[in-house]
Amino acid sequence: MCFKTLIIAVRVLPYLLVLMAPANLALSDITTSNMTFAEAVQAVKDKNYRHAVNLFELQANAAQHDAQYNLALLLKSGKGRPRNYQQALYWAWSAYLGGIEPAKNLSKDIMSLLPDDALKLTRKKIEETLLDRIDIGDKSALMELALFYEELLEEPNFEEAYLWYSIASAFLLEGAIIARDEVEVSVEMKLIVELQNRASEIFDTLSTIK
């Protein structure tokens, strides 16, 4: 597999970037830093795929979506770690929900390689991960969860998508209001009041999380 596609998700890195992180760099910094990401990209160029997988995975678990995309590519190819289509799909879907557009086609390619039960389990894991992120106050996961319900289920769940877009709108997340209004036309009128009340309750709860 050609890894030129990895460059699609490379971040805009600071000037005079140092590839190796300082020894005292905190783990929280390592999981989100451009230095770690750049080191992983360099590892791919050097064909040190195992090191690249380890670094991308570290950042993928911290919801760094470009790292998730690159990790999905590596897991799909089986370089640096045994090929695993289900894990690759999990990270490709995660990357797409986080705004990495090339992950959409990658996800479609991987889906064709998996049975229905594996797709179901992967969807469940995505949903649980997003809900866990929301529970600890990660508001960026609100839009991702709404998009998950709108696009990644076997059949769209417009009601749940509307619920979470509504909450994201109240927090003024980018694109949430437009997405909410677009989805609303697909929701039965008799359900709107109930969904809006649920959204208000969840919003109040999330507002208490610092």
Model-predicted segments: where are they?
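TPR/TPR-like (Sel1-like) alpha-helical repeat modules
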Residues: 83-101, 108, 158-175, 181, ...
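Hydrophobic face of amphipathic alpha-helices that form TPR/SEL1-like repeat modules
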Residues: 36-43, 55, 70-77, 106-114, ...
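Short helix-capping/linker turns of helical repeat alpha-solenoids
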Residues: 31, 47-48, 61-65, 77-79, ...
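Structural signature of tandem alpha-helical TPR/SEL1-like repeats
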Residues: 47-51, 82-91, 118-128, 156-160
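N-terminal leader/linker segments that initiate helical-solenoid repeat arrays
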Residues: 24-54
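Bacterial N-terminal signal peptides
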Residues: 11-21
